[in-house]
Amino acid sequence: MAHQAHPFRSVLYIPGSKERALEKARGLAADAIIFDLEDAVAHDEKIHARRLLKTTLETADYGHRFRIVRVNGMDTEWGRADLEAFAEAKADAILIPKVSRAADLEAVAALVPDLPLWAMMETAQGMLNAAEIAAHPRLTGMVMGTNDLAKELGSRYRPDRLAMQAGLGLCLLAARAHGLTIVDGVYNAFRDEEGLRAECEQGRDMGFDGKTLIHPAQLEIANAVFSPSPAEIELANRQIAAFEEAERHGQGVAVVDGKIVENLHIVTARQTLAKAEAIAAFRAS
């Protein structure tokens, strides 16, 4: 897991062209917001969305929510202008769509010298080049684009996301190898709470930091699933206490609830507590 001062349990897409949605997002319980200029904006609204979002970010207060701007691709007529407009914007990262190779980030890095870059991982080629992409020195985060990936694969939806497993795993490995944040793809049936919870739990158990969301109704479940539970926090504290006691007696392992606890378990326990503390600090802010 990447060491984070900021939680990314819930990462909500907001269309950059919708003034009311941009205003409403200021009061939502999202850890991060992706202000979208790409898929969520019609072609004839692209320029309007760019101007509206730029003004909004300059004037509106989004508190401690992490602000990500998803621009249009450099292969479109809007991509370069998007990057020039937001190169010095009040944003925390620029999200690049359809990153298939590390070279896709180079032109962006030159136009946006100061902001961190995030990559949409949503092409078959991107899956195969995930390690190369994750190694780019300007990259700090990855977002799974499972809808576009499913389209490329020609796969059908299954609750277990069998067709996605290889790509999800490759990107997770790459992100963890390079200390990046990585968030899971969207769940399209936003009124299906049971299905959303199951997919959030699957992503959490795989190792994702959080989930991208398409509707505010999904926030509560994502925040709950990707937060350490009281039982997990209690176990982490007991593991640390038991291991420290064992060390004082010259032992390298402890036993908690009939299970061996080694140093690697303590690393995980401390990460659990750090995540809980980061979430508590975010709520307090």
Swiss-Prot record:
**What keywords does the record list, in alphabetical order?**
Hydrolase, Magnesium, Metal-binding
Required co-factor(s) are: Mg(2+)
Q: Which domain of life is it from?
A: Bacteria
EC number(s) from the headed UniProt entry: 3.1.2.30
Q: What class of enzyme is it?
A: hydrolase
What's this protein's family per the entry? Belongs to the HpcH/HpaI aldolase family.
Q: What does this protein do?
A: Catalyzes the hydrolysis of (3S)-malyl-CoA to (3S)-malate and free CoA. Inactive towards beta-methylmalyl-CoA and other CoA esters.
Q: What is this protein called?
A: (3S)-malyl-CoA thioesterase
What organism, scientifically named, is this protein from?
Answer: Cereibacter sphaeroides (strain KD131 / KCTC 12085)
The gene from which this protein is expressed is mcl2
